[in-house]
């Protein structure tokens, strides 16, 4: 028995959650809702992907459904979350990937259509943040709406947990060198919130705000108030890298830190979530990787035994989407 899943919003994350779900075979996606993409266009958008390549299986329309290999998926085109008839397709676990319904109140609109649980694929101001491999044991079946946090929090949290558990983090600053996303501009345009966010993404390095480091405190309470960070949006289409610069409470050599991260990456708790490499890698080496965080042992440095800079890579699209699928699978097991 598998969780029956619906996806609301067929954008970057919605499509890649579907790819991850089909690949993992641990959940069954039975419905997709997007008011702006018709069925034929869904086939095209799922089949062809500029970052992750052409889908290697069979994608088609059959009997008014989106068919991916042997998976028959009902398609809705409702504007409002409350209007999506999820129960008609048997969908109970809803991935909210529009980027709009990110509060408990807004996400709860899905319950009107028969949803049982909602997983927000973005940070949320008021829902519980649950991260597989970091704080999944905090999930309780009474929780109806949960957030999988952001892709950057998903990269940072496993690394921060390992470092804090082994050496203690007094305080730290995070910088993510982040690929551009759909919120940025192809050419210079207006941006009321932050003017430089409106500059062309493919031509500039754009300093930007991010709450990813602060949100680590939501999944690791002992780090609450100890981390903050910022982003540089750079002209690459996918894959990003986190720089965690932190002060340790317990002195450690860089070799000891590497050993601790390597052990953690091989543990049952973090296997497939945190990986370790000593290869001389670059960003494209991580396209379509399924883990949340890959520690780059060669890239980090230490000023002394208590002040270090640690580097971790992540596919900010597909790696994140794989954790959404893992979270649904874990919730389903706990719920049943």
From Swiss-Prot:
It is found in: Cytoplasm. It catalyses: D-glyceraldehyde 3-phosphate + phosphate + NAD(+) = (2R)-3-phospho-glyceroyl phosphate + NADH + H(+). GO terms for biological process: glucose metabolic process; glycolytic process. Pathway: Carbohydrate degradation; glycolysis; pyruvate from D-glyceraldehyde 3-phosphate: step 1/5. It is an enzyme of class 1 (oxidoreductase). Homotetramer. The record marks 178 as: Activates thiol group during catalysis. Belongs to the glyceraldehyde-3-phosphate dehydrogenase family. GO terms for molecular function: glyceraldehyde-3-phosphate dehydrogenase (NAD+) (phosphorylating) activity; NAD binding; NADP binding. PROSITE patterns: GAPDH. Its EC number is 1.2.1.12. D-glyceraldehyde 3-phosphate binds at residues 150-152, 181, 210-211, 233. This is Glyceraldehyde-3-phosphate dehydrogenase. Keywords: Cytoplasm, Glycolysis, NAD, Oxidoreductase. NAD(+) binds at residues 12-13, 34, 79, 316. Its main location: cytoplasm.
